[in-house]
Amino acid sequence: MNRIHAVILDWAGTTVDFGSFAPTQIFVEAFRQAFDVEITLAEARVPMGLGKWQHIEALGKLPAVDARWQAKFGRSMSAADIDAIYAAFMPLQIAKVVDFSSPIAGVIDTIAALRAEGIKIGSCSGYPRAVMERLVPAAAEHGYRPDHWVATDDLAAGGRPGPWMALQNVIALGIDAVAHCVKVDDAAPGISEGLNAGMWTVGLAVSGNEFGATWDAYQTMSKEDVAVRREHAASKLYAAGAHYVVDSLADLSGVIAHINARLAQGERP
């Protein structure tokens, strides 16, 4: 049938951890612990969506971070430095990820509605398997249980922005065509992942990394501040090529209906 058969969802900032704070805070701590180098939360957010080793590598290439590194060590960050930061990052992330495992508002109801329509729920993450093995059961205790998940270090081909984690979901879920899949993510590399896999893509402008606020902060934010942050996030997601941008996963059902209408007219991603 020419309709959406599966959605492939990111984790932090998409289904759990409103604002995607678990990884950003840990990057700051890992740089400090490994080399006593300070980075800001805003800097930590810039490469979000990549695998975590690649994320650290990208942070080291940010001009401001590279300048700090050069001032301290007289050289740019090396692969050995990245390994050391990653070694500090992993135990911190494994220990703390369960504290950020609660589903974002609207996720459980949206998943139930999608499943009622016969849509399968795939997922993938920039987290490595050691972190996902803690996060997945913790999220399940809160009621979020996707049909499949893939970690960034599971596949020899690699992670985002390549298509491989998304395509592994297609295989595992037995989906007949990538055009019948929707990739949902709050960061640009995840949108690129979906596009590279030949899927429809939906960006989330409020619940995730680009908006960058806690749930409590979002609830008390002025309409003006929300609008500015939303526009900033949406522009980045559209620039990455997202077919649609909505606030959070709670808005996905309407998008699915719109995509189904386009598929019925013969359109493809």
UniProtKB/Swiss-Prot annotation:
**Catalytic activity, per the record?**
phosphonoacetaldehyde + H2O = acetaldehyde + phosphate + H(+)
The cofactor remark states:
Binds 1 Mg(2+) ion per subunit.
Q: What is its EC number?
A: 3.11.1.1
Q: Which GO terms describe its biological process?
A: DNA repair; organic phosphonate catabolic process
- The answer, when asked if Translocase is one of the entry's keywords, is no
- Transmembrane residues, as ranges? none
The active site consists of D10 (nucleophile), K52 (schiff-base intermediate with substrate)
> Molecular function (GO) terms listed?
magnesium ion binding; phosphoglycolate phosphatase activity; phosphonoacetaldehyde hydrolase activity
Q: Which SUPFAM superfamilies match?
A: HAD-like
Q: Which InterPro entries match?
A: HAD-like_hydrolase_sf, HAD-like_sf, HAD-SF_hydro_IA, HAD_sf, PGP-like_dom2, Phosphonoacetald_hydro
Q: What Pfam families does the record point to?
A: Hydrolase
Q: Cofactors per UniProt?
A: Mg(2+)
Residues that hold Mg(2+) according to the record: D10, A12, D186
Q: Which GO cellular component terms are attached?
A: cytosol
| Protein keywords | Hydrolase, Magnesium, Metal-binding, Schiff base
Q: Does the keyword Phosphoprotein apply?
A: no
Please give the NCBIfam families that the UniProt record associates with this protein: HAD-SF-IA-v3, phosphonatase
The function of this protein is: Involved in phosphonate degradation.
Concerning its family, UniProt says:
Belongs to the HAD-like hydrolase superfamily. PhnX family.
Oligomeric form and interacting partners: Homodimer.
Q: What name does UniProt use for this protein?
A: Phosphonoacetaldehyde hydrolase
**Originating organism:** Salmonella dublin (strain CT_02021853)
